[in-house]
Amino acid sequence: MSRYQLCFEALAQKQQGAFVPFVTLGDPDAELSLKIIDALIEGGADALEIGIPFSDPLADGPTIQGANLRALNANVTPTLCFELLSQIRQKHPTIPIGLLVYANLVFSNGVDNFYHKCQQAGVDSVLIGDVPLREAKQFREAALSANIAPIFICPPNADDELLQELATSAEGYTYLLSRAGVTGTDKRAEQSLTHLTSKLKAYNAPPALQGFGISEPQQVSQAISNGAFGAISGSAVVQIIENNLHQPDVMLKMLTQFVQQMKAATISV
């Protein structure tokens, strides 16, 4: 069984959903980035979603673009990121680790080589933010041959055909998009996605984790009551980093507290 399957089964037995924070690796620098990961896990993160710094993150709003720039300015390269990922995996052997990257980064490493590096570093899944499912064949095959789960986005306007394709193509989890657009906390996740989650379950798709606009515990509860297995929060996490760059101890404490609050919202009363 994969780390995702083990994680989700254990949570289901405890009647809990999953809370997954996102950060850009190397933000604001490599050393502090590792402490940030520890703080997120200490707070109760069930899995991690990690970005590799990239100069043109198309799907990201200004908060996560800022994280990319800080990491790039700290000379964080993809090679260093794989070293950091190996360290994270060594310290935290059971937590699922997913990467959110862009196609240029994968191509520049060579597609097969990129997934091989992921496998060597202990990565569990890869989501390529700018490659829709229908263009993903090459990436999916390379992922599966390296024992990496290919993650795909389910948009809020997905039709039946796409939902069935997602169910048969995806592994690990399904990234359920709260809304169209770019990431950020100013555009809240308001739309009910029950019709999508019920169909994804009917088609036996991997568990849905809802992302985009998730910044408050009540949105995590809402995502789960709408049928998602859990929620992913990125911009709200990165905002805490950005707001506390000059007081890292406060930053780490606030990150742990934020995850604790969001995780608490996944627990059935």
Swiss-Prot record:
Active site: residue positions: 49, 60
Keyword Lyase: yes
Keyword field contains Glycosyltransferase: no
Keywords, sorted A to Z: Amino-acid biosynthesis, Aromatic amino acid biosynthesis, Lyase, Tryptophan biosynthesis
Domain of life the protein comes from: Bacteria
GO cellular component, as recorded: cytosol
Matching CDD domains: Tryptophan_synthase_alpha
Enzyme Commission (EC) number: 4.2.1.20
Catalytic activity: (1S,2R)-1-C-(indol-3-yl)glycerol 3-phosphate + L-serine = D-glyceraldehyde 3-phosphate + L-tryptophan + H2O
GO MF, any single term: tryptophan synthase activity
Pathway the protein acts in: Amino-acid biosynthesis; L-tryptophan biosynthesis; L-tryptophan from chorismate: step 5/5
Transmembrane segments: none
Enzyme kind, highest EC tier: lyase
Membership in a protein family: Belongs to the TrpA family.
Role according to the record: The alpha subunit is responsible for the aldol cleavage of indoleglycerol phosphate to indole and glyceraldehyde 3-phosphate.
Subunit and interaction comment: Tetramer of two alpha and two beta chains.
Name the record gives this protein: Tryptophan synthase alpha chain
Protein source organism: Proteus mirabilis (strain HI4320)
